[in-house]
């Protein structure tokens, strides 16, 4: 069983071989097997979320239309449909992946339940949430100011991924945040 999973995993990376011209990534099975480890690739984020989706192109379009993401890499799967993409949103990276037999990750369930929420900072949360809605997102929590100094709104994209979209509107100290939270907690008990 595990040898079959490993073979599928390696075949998955065979079609994902890529060398990005902007020094982002250089991955292939051969690199993993024969090159010395370099830790974090030059130009890469230490943590890169991988969003598994039923429709990779729709998720790419959502990220571009909502966040102004830049598509850096797109690779087809065995069926020639888009199966992998690397996007950047500001300095952050995000990978969009198709479902792949044998891998332990799946897209969110149709009801949108997911153990992961992506928190993304933008220049204008209100306009970004409007763009998200225009791109097919559903508002989960409307945009409002928070005690820690962010203005945030929660949306679920058409693929079922949940995003907290935020703009920092006020710099606060930990003491200020604690005092505000204490007031909120006291008011909620009334």
Which residues fall in each region the model found?
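Position-driven detector of the extreme protein N-terminus
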Residues: 2-3, 17, 28, 96
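Short stretches within intrinsically disordered, low-complexity N-terminal or propeptide regions
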Residues: 8-9, 23, 71, 139
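Extreme N-terminal basic, low-complexity initiation segments
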Residues: 1-10
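C-terminal catalytic core of tyrosine-transesterase DNA break-rejoin enzymes
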Residues: 159
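Short, Lys/Arg-enriched N-terminal segments with co-localized hydrophobic residues
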Residues: 12, 16-32
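Vicinal oxygen chelate
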Residues: 32-50, 60-61, 67-156, 165-190
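Short acidic-aromatic low-complexity motifs
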Residues: 53-57
């Amino acid at each position: 069983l595990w040898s079959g999973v490993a073979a599928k995993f390696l075949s998955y990376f065979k079609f994902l071989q890529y060398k990005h011209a902007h020094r982002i990534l250089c991955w292939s099975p051969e690199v993993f097997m024969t090159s010395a480890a370099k830790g974090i690739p030059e130009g890469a984020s230490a943590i890169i979320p991988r969003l598994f989706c039923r429709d990779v192109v729709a998720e790419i379009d959502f990220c571009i239309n909502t966040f102004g993401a830049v598509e850096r890499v797109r690779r087809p799967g065995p069926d020639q449909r888009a199966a992998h993409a690397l996007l950047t949103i500001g300095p952050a990276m995000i990978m969009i992946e198709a479902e792949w037999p044998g891998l332990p990750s799946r897209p969110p369930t149709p009801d949108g339940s997911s153990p992961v929420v992506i928190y993304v900072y933008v220049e204008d949360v209100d306009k970004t949430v409007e763009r998200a809605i225009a791109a097919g997102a559903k508002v989960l929590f409307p945009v409002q100011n928070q005690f820690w100094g962010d203005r945030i709104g929660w949306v679920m994209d058409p693929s079922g991924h949940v995003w907290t979209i935020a703009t920092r509107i006020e710099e606060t100290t930990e003491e200020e945040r604690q005092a505000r939270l204490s007031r909120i907690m006291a008011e909620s008990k009334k």
